[in-house]
Amino acid sequence: MKIKHIVSCFFVSLIGLSACSIEELPYNQLTEDELDGSYESLLSATRGNYAVFKQTAFHQGWHYAGELASDNVSLSGVSSDALMYIYNYQRITDNYHMSNMWGWAYRSIINSNKILEKAQEGESKEMDQLIGENYFLRGWLEFVLVNVFGRPYNQSPETNLGIPLN
């Protein structure tokens, strides 16, 4: 009986230790090695950049920043959500709506930069199309971030430069 218990403990620990070397890669993301400069890998990464716009965390923050801080929306009642700070023109550094928007936008900007580093201009019309799309995506996201987080130009333009570009 004792030997059965020892053998069963041995097999359980053997199975447990063998699971330590399992490395699961994300099924919907590319690794740095997979982004090899081929058209297919760059197309897949560009599609991933477009997927950012479906993220609630991105478009919700963008919508809140533009609409709640304007006269287009009227909130009534009491809420403990951080959107009330936006509605009342109170900027707080830990507003998760704004930090999520910032994070998703910069994730796509960084991905566009990586794609633009790997892509070879003039290789084909399709590759040039991808390069143009990534320049547009990066520029548009930087434009959105400056509109939401940047200061007006007349408020110390020497020190308030907008957003970090890299």
Ranges and model annotations:
Residues 1-28:
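Bacterial Sec-dependent N-terminal signal peptides
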Residues 20-63:
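Membrane-proximal, proline-rich intrinsically disordered regions
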Residues 23-31, 36, 69, 88-90, ...:
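Generic, ordered loop/turn and secondary-structure boundary motif
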Residues 40, 48, 55-57, 63, ...:
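A structural signal for short, hydrophobic/glycine-enriched beta-strand patches
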Residues 54-60, 73-76, 141-152:
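Secretory-pathway/luminal and periplasmic proteins that interact with or process carbohydrate-rich
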Residues 82-149:
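Conserved, well-structured interaction surfaces
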Residues 148-166:
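Short coil/linker segments at helix-helix boundaries
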